[in-house]
Structures are given as C-alpha cells and as structure tokens.
Amino acid sequence: MFTVLLNKRAQKDLLDLPKNDVRRIRTTLNELAQETEPWLLVKKLQSHEEVPLYSCQVGHYRIILTIDHGHLIIFVITIHHRHSAYRNI
C-alpha cells in the first residue's frame, strides 16, 4: 500500500478545480494508493528518465506524479487540464 503526498502546487491546483472533479481525482489517487503496483495503471512520460514522471488521466484532467518504489510513496507534482498539463514540468 502506497502513501499519496501532494506538493504545494498540486494542493493549490486542487483548490482551483470544481468539487465534483476534485472528488474524482481523490478517488483515483486513493485507488492508486491501494494498488501493489500503481505504475501499471499510469502512463510513463518519455522525456524524464533521471526521475521518471507518470501521468494519470481523470476526465479532462491529468495528474503528473512520481512513484518512490523503495518508500512506497506516490508524490503528486501537479494537476491540470489536459491542454496545459504537460507545460513547465
């Protein structure tokens, strides 16, 4: 079982979203935390090899995250609409 941590940017992103989307995102993050191999449920981004980044789709939003396999932590970096999710990461 993994622990989900959100950085300050991701916390701020959640505050800017509609409540029903926030509920769906939280449900998805909880489901990822319950998985024994959450990296199988997300898409690995190709341009980040030194620290692998993953993308998780929830409706029109994308959750950009990293997974620390050793410490069993899912660290959420940002949550944005799909049109702007991959900028500045």
Language-model region placement:
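A short, surface-exposed loop/turn module that caps and links secondary-structure elements
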Residues: N30-C56
